[in-house]
């Protein structure tokens, strides 16, 4: 990730915040949505500068759809709204953590979280094959 390329879409994001962001080659940063009161990770979306600006100023999560090439506000179609409680950058300024109050399902499958269907390692499992322990 690099901080030099600017997104091709116009943005009203505060210049100081924009200068700190390290974006992918296509001008995006991953945005993790986390339930503010439980800490449960809900989903991963993508934001460009304008999506982050809209998220910071409207109190609702706005993402950039890589497949559709357009902005989408979580819940506008489904009713499964994400109300923003806080927004933070990670230590490298290449990922955004958005703590939200999720109404309904976060996942497009209808599940509350996108991270519950394909668990690769569970609590209590060491992750090390039995022969190697």
Swiss-Prot record:
It comes from the Bacteria. Its main location: cytoplasm. Gene3D superfamilies: Phosphoribosyl-AMP cyclohydrolase. This is Phosphoribosyl-AMP cyclohydrolase. It comes from Streptomyces avermitilis (strain ATCC 31267 / DSM 46492 / JCM 5070 / NBRC 14893 / NCIMB 12804 / NRRL 8165 / MA-4680). Zn(2+) binds at residues 91, 107, 114. Binds 1 Mg(2+) ion per subunit. Binds 1 zinc ion per subunit. It is found in: Cytoplasm. InterPro entries: PRA-CH, PRib_AMP_CycHydrolase_dom, PRib_AMP_CycHydrolase_sf. GO terms for biological process: L-histidine biosynthetic process. Pathway: Amino-acid biosynthesis; L-histidine biosynthesis; L-histidine from 5-phospho-alpha-D-ribose 1-diphosphate: step 3/9. Homodimer. Pfam families: PRA-CH. Keywords: Amino-acid biosynthesis, Cytoplasm, Histidine biosynthesis, Hydrolase, Magnesium, Metal-binding, Zinc. The keyword Amino-acid biosynthesis applies. SUPFAM superfamilies: HisI-like. The keyword Zinc applies. One of its GO terms (molecular function) is phosphoribosyl-AMP cyclohydrolase activity. Mg(2+) binds at residues 90, 92, 94. NCBIfam families: PRK00051.1 (NF000768). The lineage of its organism: Bacteria, Bacillati, Actinomycetota, Actinomycetes, Kitasatosporales. Its cofactor is Mg(2+); Zn(2+). It catalyses: 1-(5-phospho-beta-D-ribosyl)-5'-AMP + H2O = 1-(5-phospho-beta-D-ribosyl)-5-[(5-phospho-beta-D-ribosylamino)methylideneamino]imidazole-4-carboxamide. GO terms for cellular component: cytoplasm.
């Amino acid at each position: 990730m690099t901080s030099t390329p600017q997104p091709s879409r116009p943005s009203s994001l505060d210049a100081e915040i924009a200068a700190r962001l390290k974006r992918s080659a296509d001008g995006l940063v991953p945005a993790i949505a986390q339930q503010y009161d439980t800490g449960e990770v809900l989903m991963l979306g993508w934001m460009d500068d304008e999506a982050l600006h809209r998220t910071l100023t409207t109190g609702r999560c706005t993402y950039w759809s890589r497949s559709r090439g357009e902005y989408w506000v979580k819940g506008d179609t489904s009713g499964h709204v994400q109300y923003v409680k806080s927004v933070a950058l990670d230590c490298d300024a290449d990922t955004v953590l958005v703590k939200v109050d999720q109404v309904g399902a976060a996942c497009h499958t209808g599940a509350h979280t996108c991270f519950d269907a394909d668990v690769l390692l569970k609590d209590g499992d060491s992750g090390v094959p039995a022969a190697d322990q």
